[in-house]
Amino acid sequence: QLGKDYALKEHIILDLPNESFISSALINKELKPNEFNTVDDLVSGFVNSYVPFRNMIFLSFALSIAESNNIDQIFVGFNKDDSINYWDCKENFINHINIISGLNTTIKIKSPFINLSKKEVVLLGKSLGVNYDNTISCYQPIGNVECGCCLSCVIKKEAFNE
């Protein structure tokens, strides 16, 4: 829906093999993502929603598509809260991906929210008139309804309630 609201020119959906990532509760339906009541419950380190090298895989595809279509910028929505448990959401990761892609292209990965908390991103969006009604951050939504207790839901809930 958001793509339509913002007149997105093209939306590409890639079909990736899930069976390679069975250690992640986001892929392996036999595992249930860790549940949290508040962000304070979160401990820095491994959470079972981690998909090994997920963002490197996504960015590799994005770089390939961008180069094939003469696109020189790719934007990602990583924020400071993402980097607590996911190494591939950190500024250092983006910097290194840009170094690697710079060996052959001028394409730049941009991460404008990398130093902002989820709360700061929400406040910025509200100040710009972003409609959050159709957004889902949940790791295990049922239809369009968020679970409310996975890591992503708890971070989002606290960002909107603070």
Question: What name fits each language-model region?
Answer:
Residues S60, N134-E158:
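Local cysteine-cluster metal-coordination motifs and their immediate loop/turn environment
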Residues Q1-L128:
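ATP-dependent adenylation/nucleotidyltransferase module used to activate substrates
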